[in-house]
């Protein structure tokens, strides 16, 4: 069974959320049921649940790892928006 570390973006508040799940679709749907503004912007898949939990913990505890990932996500979103503007 695969395990996932994911990042959601709240389109209304621009807040990012880090989570862990073994069923990514179901977990994202649960977030969206509470607040439809959440959207999946990034995820990592792991064969080991322990590895995924450790990665989630690292991102939440170590500011440099989370900061690096946030910059990566932001660059990706900026490029996507630029592409959408050209269409």
Model-predicted regions and their roles:
Residues 1-60, 64, 71-87:
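GIY-YIG nuclease catalytic motif and its immediate N-terminal context
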């Amino acid at each position: 069974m695969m395990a996932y570390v994911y990042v959601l973006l709240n389109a209304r508040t621009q807040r990012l959320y880090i989570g862990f799940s073994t069923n990514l679709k179901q977990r994202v749907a649960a977030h969206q049921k509470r607040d439809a503004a959440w959207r999946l912007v990034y995820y990592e898949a792991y064969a080991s649940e322990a590895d995924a939990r450790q990665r989630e913990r690292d991102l939440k505890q170590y500011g440099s790892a989370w900061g690096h990932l946030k910059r990566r996500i932001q660059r990706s979103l900026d490029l996507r928006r630029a592409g959408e503007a050209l269409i």
